[in-house]
Amino acid sequence: MPVRRLLAPDAPAFREIRLEGLRDYPDAFGASMREEAAMPLASFEQNLDRGFVLGGDMPDGQLGGVAGLRFNETDRTRHKAWLWGMYVRPPARGTGLAASLITGIVDEARGKVEEVVLTVGDHNAAAIARYRSMGFEACGVEHRALKVGEIYVNDLMMSFRF
């Protein structure tokens, strides 16, 4: 499934899908729906212009999924980049969009860093299996990484090394 880089004009659609993911899967993201819903649209526009975010459209033209790549900027961590904000809407699941987004992120990082890292809730077996199938390997666990209400979420760290 084709993916494309999202830019400032895509900010309203990006904001919509991002907030949907935060609302429907609060234990899957470090950010909260409340925090990001309070951000002005201009913040989403700036994130798209300054960062690297991919999106894939469904046949109806609506964004079906998104994933971002953030490059570290400090001397000692510049060899790594982070895959963040991965979310595929339920109607787009099983279409190959998740694989296309991950491939696009890895391709963008190739030749620029030594590895792409991500974190995923250790309870999210489907996401972990998808990342493993794409070449990511588990490399650590952060216990109690997130606290959603009164529930703690452990994050599995995974890495794709070039």
For each feature predicted by the language model, list its residue ranges.
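Conserved glycine-rich acetyl-CoA-binding loop
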Residues: 76-77, 85, 89-103, 121-129, ...
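Conserved catalytic-core motifs of GNAT/GCN5-like acyltransferases
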Residues: 117-121, 132, 137-153
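Conserved GNAT acetyl-CoA-binding A-motif
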Residues: 109-119
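Acetyl-CoA-dependent GNAT
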Residues: 8-11, 15-16, 20-91, 102-108, ...
